[in-house]
Amino acid sequence: MGLDQYAWIKKAEATRDEHEWSISWRKHSRLQEFMQSIWVARGNSQDDFNCVDMELTKKDITLLSCAVRTAYEDYVCKEGFFWGHQFQEEAAKESYKDDLEFVDAAFDAIDKGLEVYYSCWY
């Protein structure tokens, strides 16, 4: 039980399972806070951000790049035992290379006309 997170890159006409590249995280609560802030900024309810495929834009990835490089200092998770909030600083440090790999892959994919998605399950 807990927070599982996924991101993938695919061609526009491909299904989710026909992705070109993917990555996953486990209980990376600060990444979740960041992604949830995008979801809410788009006019969605915070409570609805579970098991939803959210397409990310180049602007989203630019913001994510900044968040990663600052250890998500503006996206501290205040609660959420099952999200791993109690060890969120360590999770951000441990995921740093993976997060940057995702950022780089996402920028490259968008430049090539591919789509980038994020989803979570908790």
Where is each model-derived feature located?
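Acidic (Asp/Glu-rich) sequence patches and key acidic residues
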Residues: 1-114, 120-122
